[in-house]
């Protein structure tokens, strides 16, 4: 998108809650090719904006920056805060000077308190797993707990433990301890998008048929689906479908208020 198009959409959705804005911006990236650069194209090029490709980290960064900024320029300034453990610095040529100080681990993002408030414990019984990189233990919602939700009569999308998910919530997917390569706890990140769909059903009332409208809330995950050596793209999928087939052992969740 051009700066003009970005500014127009920022203005269009400015009155919506921040979570909705995050989800709407994430949705704008659906179909974007997966970033094949091992470091991330934005890191290699030392730029803030590299919207031609996206991995899960860049999608997370950009959706929040664009949602919180009122202009494209303000989004860049927000990026200097959100992407970095301390704060990003730009040179006179607009290039990033200190990408080595960026968030490289999803667990560092959620534990920084700058990537929303952690709400993991609101979705069911938490399980403790072995941590790494200075964390003795980490509390997660296990995949087993999530699948138990999906086996309920209303399914994962409508189950009580996930009915609290809101637009723009961040889901951090947790790797099995034995699959960690460089001490990483989080293996993937996605953004929640909810939609309400109306369904009509026929009911009988006083021997007369009438149409009754029922709203069904669907929960989607927007995420950069791919591998650095195989490609892919940003997808929007049912959260229940992703949970059923995901290679991760659980999740943590954060929310911007």
Residue ranges and their predicted role:
Residues 1-139, 164, 181-183:
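N-terminal capping segments
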Residues 6, 10, 44, 155, ...:
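Generic preference for well-ordered secondary structure
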Residues 25-26, 60, 155-158, 166-167, ...:
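Generic detector of short, locally flexible boundary/turn motifs and exposed helical patches
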Residues 48-55, 77, 207, 215, ...:
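Bimodal feature
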Residues 77, 86, 92-93, 98, ...:
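Detector for Asparagine
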Residues 127-179:
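A mid-sequence, solvent-exposed acidic-amphipathic segment
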Residues 153-156, 194-218, 257:
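Short, basic, low-complexity termini and linkers enriched in Ser/Thr/Gly/Pro
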Residues 162, 167-176, 184-187, 191-194, ...:
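Low-complexity, Gly/Ser/Thr/Pro-rich intrinsically disordered linker/tail segments
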